[in-house]
Structures are given as C-alpha cells and as structure tokens.
Amino acid sequence: MDKDIKAIIILLATQAMINMGEIQDPITHEAKDDLDGAAVFIELLDILESKTQGNLTTEEEAFLIEVRENLDQVYNKKISAG
C-alpha cells in the first residue's frame, strides 16, 4: 500500500475521531465534542474517495472504505445519542 495515501486517510480519520471525542486531543489532552468538525473530516474522506476512484489499489480502496464505514458508525451513534 502506498504510504502516502494511507497516511492521508489515517490523518483525516484521526481528526474525525478527535472531534468526536473518541481520541483525546493530543494538545489539550481533553476529549472534544465537535460533531460538525468531525463531519468536515468525514466529508474530506468522501472527496478523497471520489477523486481517487479507479486510481487506488484494491488494498487502498478497501482500507478507505473500511475507515469510512467505521467513522460512519461512530458518527451515527454520537448523533443518535444527542
């Protein structure tokens, strides 16, 4: 797998998880509760997926889809919890 694309996916997913409070902010060491912020990073992953369609290896595409699905589950759970 190309480390560059994986690094971008991980970077965006990590920021989404930080904004959803699933990972502590590495600077403040506090859990955030910013679902709007998380949505921005999730949307960026959607853009990445659409712009790279047909140009990713099978492994890269599967990784991106898995990360997106996991983020969707966490995001929807947070939204439902209110």
Language-model-detected regions and their locations in the chain:
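Acidic, glycine-enriched active-site microenvironments
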Residues: T52
